[in-house]
UniProtKB/Swiss-Prot annotation:
The lineage of its organism: Eukaryota, Metazoa, Chordata, Craniata, Vertebrata. It is an enzyme of class 2 (transferase). It is found in: Endoplasmic reticulum membrane. SUPFAM superfamilies: Fibronectin type III. This is Protein O-linked-mannose beta-1,4-N-acetylglucosaminyltransferase 2. One of its GO terms (biological process) is protein O-linked glycosylation. Glycans are attached at residues 99, 276. The gene is POMGNT2. Its EC number is 2.4.1.312. InterPro entries: FN3_dom, FN3_sf, Glyco_transf_61_cat, Glycosyltransferase_61, Ig-like_fold. GO terms for cellular component: endoplasmic reticulum; endoplasmic reticulum membrane. It catalyses: 3-O-(alpha-D-mannosyl)-L-threonyl-[protein] + UDP-N-acetyl-alpha-D-glucosamine = 3-O-(N-acetyl-beta-D-glucosaminyl-(1->4)-alpha-D-mannosyl)-L-threonyl-[protein] + UDP + H(+). Residues 26-580 are lumenal. It comes from Pan troglodytes. The chain crosses the membrane at residues 5-25. Residues 1-4 are cytoplasmic.
Length: 580
């Protein structure tokens, strides 16, 4: 009898444990269903989010998937889908062909050369490609029952969610502007991250971009074996990126940067508002220099001495901040009011985008690391409209560096290399240009600790910062371009058999009367018809008589454009055909 009682007790315990686990799994699934707004989330009105399941299934089975993309190649393409599906078992997206399916562009096998599009903003990286498999809609009869996602989805990859530079440059900025590229998307979309990473150290920043909780690929498995998106955008705009990381050629600024400080600062303003960081600035006399303190590697060994020297030189207090010890909102608050930001090279310097106009960025580089070869933060600071001063300082003294050859290879260790290679690296005075991402000499040098030579640092800063550093009230510096000159005309006169004159005149661009422009000039190109070369002229007036090399009874082509402040070149007006 006792044995039976014990057995029954054990059986009850096991059943209770199984039931408890089942209940917890059901609770987890229910939570995710709520996150998908399946009609039960108070902040997202149920009528707008519920899916009429029978109708949705009928549309999918009869009509199939619908896709229309923008962009000519996989590196600049964003696609808009209706009824795109995802198999959690196969970990593949599915395009179901039905009676009303549309696939534009219809690439055929070119869709695999190499992919339909990039899921991240790191261009043409073979781990970031997006594609789908194709099935007839009739195959749905033999597949798991689809779960329909009612949210408008923005589907993308995060490239490296544990690195703050990658988070801002590759993800947050592109997400912010992709959401604003399509009407209503910023207020309706839910972000789906498909790269397979966990949340990462900065997931809270992604949550600021949309009123709906982002979802990761791993979370989708709990929702069903087959998910179908009623409306989805796939891919990210790369238009805000300014740097390439060296996968094909050594790292450096992108060849064709399309973003300015204006767009960066609008994004920064959005982020500071979401983080509840004020824009009031600091009172007069309370200005400060902010020094980023690192706690694990790439240390400033004489940090206290550096703080004192900066305070004495610039007659303002110095403050330290670190990503490890401060909430990110506090970091942004300190950066956004700083007169100068000083930091070793590292991801924390992407916070430069929060600096006020007129502030100074001072980037410190360890021994043997050439600042000209690693410029993501210089490129950011020097974007037109950022209005920042940038200073790079490099440790030139090997005795002021502390190396760590015994560390793991990914933290700069080199003991895994043969002795000859170790000796070469130790004797090298500069890391050669290299590709990303495992160059042992680069890792060895970038993870060094540095004793900053303070006199040389102050001297380097003073070459750029002549007076007291700090934010300044500046007029809007984004250049406005002239329109076309108007009413261009020409008049010719002939004097004898070998002499002629050609007078060209025009009216100012119509937008000039609404602008305050420091200097206005005009560029005129003069070309004899049939010749391959032209003669350019820069003129201050709105008319000019040309006599040099003007031939009688000859046809000339004339182009005229306006130039503001020597660098803002307007468009050429329509070509003038002038006969002498």
């Amino acid at each position: 009898m006792h044995l039976s009682a014990v057995f029954n007790a054990l059986l009850v315990s096991v059943l209770a444990a199984v039931l408890w686990k089942h209940v917890r799994l059901r609770e987890h699934a229910a939570t995710l269903e709520e996150e998908l707004a399946l009609g039960r989330q108070a902040t997202e009105p149920a009528p707008a989010l519920r899916i009429d399941y029978p109708k949705a299934l009928q549309i999918l089975m009869e009509g199939g998937t619908h896709m229309v993309c923008t962009g000519r190649t996989h590196t600049d393409r964003i696609c808009r889908f209706k009824w795109l599906c995802y198999s959690n078992e196969a970990e593949e997206f599915i395009f179901f062909h039905g009676n009303t399916s549309v696939m534009l562009p219809n690439l055929g096998s070119r869709r695999f050369q190499p992919a339909l599009l990039d899921l991240s903003t790191v261009e043409d990286h073979n781990t970031q490609y997006f594609n789908f498999v194709e099935l007839p809609a009739a195959a749905l009869r033999f597949m798991p029952k689809p779960v329909f996602v009612p949210d408008v989805a923005l589907i993308a990859n995060r490239f490296n969610p544990d690195n703050l530079m990658h988070v801002f440059h590759d993800d947050l900025l592109p997400l912010f502007y992709t959401l604003r590229q399509f009407p209503g998307l910023a207020h309706e979309a839910r972000l789906f991250f498909m790269e397979g990473w966990g949340e990462g150290a900065h997931f809270d920043l992604y949550k600021l971009l949309s009123p709906k909780q982002p979802l990761l690929r791993a979370q989708l498995k709990t929702l069903g074996r087959l998910l179908c998106f009623s409306h989805a955008f796939v891919g990210l705009s790369k238009i805000t990126t300014w740097y390439q990381y060296g996968f094909v050629q050594p790292q450096g600024p992108k060849a064709n940067i399309l973003v300015s400080g204006n767009e960066i600062r609008q994004f920064a303003r959005f982020m500071t508002e979401k983080l509840n960081v004020s824009h009031t600035g600091v009172p007069l006399g309370e200005e400060y220099i902010l020094v980023f303190s690192r706690t694990q590697n790439r240390l400033i060994l004489n940090e206290a001495e550096l703080l004192l020297a900066l305070a004495q030189e610039f007659q303002m207090k110095t403050v330290t901040v670190s990503l490890e010890d401060h909430a990110f909102a506090d970091v942004v608050r300190l950066v956004s009011n700083a007169s100068m930001l000083v930091s070793m090279h590292g991801a924390q310097l992407v916070t430069t985008l929060f600096l006020p106009r007129g502030a100074t960025v001072v980037e410190l580089f360890p021994y043997a690391v050439n600042p000209d070869h690693y410029t993501p933060y210089k490129t950011l600071a020097m974007l037109p409209g950022m209005d920042l001063q940038y200073v790079a300082w490099r440790n030139m003294m090997p005795e002021n560096t502390v190396t760590h050859p015994e560390r793991p290879w990914d933290q700069g260790g080199i003991t895994h290399l043969d002795r000859a290679e170790q000796a070469r690296i130790l004797q090298s005075r500069e890391v050669p240009r290299h590709l990303c991402c495992r160059n042992p000499e680069w890792l060895f040098r970038i993870y060094q600790d540095t004793k900053v030579d303070i006199p040389s640092l102050i001297q380097t800063i003073r070459r750029v910062v002549k007076g007291r550093p700090g934010p300044r009230k500046q007029k809007w510096t984004v250049g406005l371009y002239p329109g076309k000159v108007r009413e261009a005309r020409c008049q010719a006169s002939v004097h004898g058999a070998s002499e002629a004159r050609l007078t060209v005149s025009w009216q100012i661009p119509w937008n000039l009367k609404y602008l305050k422009v420091r200097e206005v000039k005009y560029e005129v190109w003069l070309q004899e018809q049939g010749e391959n070369t032209y003669v350019p002229y820069i003129l201050a007036l709105q008319n000019h008589t040309f006599t040099e090399n003007i031939k009688p009874f000859t046809t000339y082509l004339v182009w005229v454009r306006c130039i503001f402040n020597k660098i803002l070149l307007g468009p050429f007006a329509d070509v003038l055909v002038c006969n002498t």
